[in-house]
Amino acid sequence: MEKMRQQLMEWGKELETFRLPHWEELPDLELYMDQVRTLVDRYLSPVIQGEKHPLLTSSMVNNYVKLGLIPAPVKKRYNKEHVAFLLAITTLKQVLTIPEIKEGILFQGKTVGIREAYNLFCDEQEAAVWMVSQLAQGKSHPQKF
């Protein structure tokens, strides 16, 4: 039990510095599918662990295009808008259904625009992960602000 508690505290400490790239920090160049998948995995692996399957597959991306969750790539290349959508979808699908995610993305996109919606998503995710990190370290009633 003590070893598990120690591992939880170490994981909590690692999560303290977790950050998602905000819109301005996303790559400005066009990427191929494998590069996008690697990037999404790199950004999200600190918070989505223990999966025996990849966080994002080519089939998933193609399905998201077919379902209208993300725009189609241009000449098999993906831009920062695609990466932002895929980071949000991959994170949110851990707790929401695809139809719920689509509804939320469409609503937020229309309300504040894609950039602002994505940056708000990043801020909220970082705050939530920070809270989890504090609880994992045994700190009761953590407050960031």
Language-model region placement:
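Intrinsically disordered, low-complexity, charge-dense segments enriched in Lys/Arg
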Residues: 104-145
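Basic helix-turn-helix/winged-helix DNA-binding cores
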Residues: 2-108
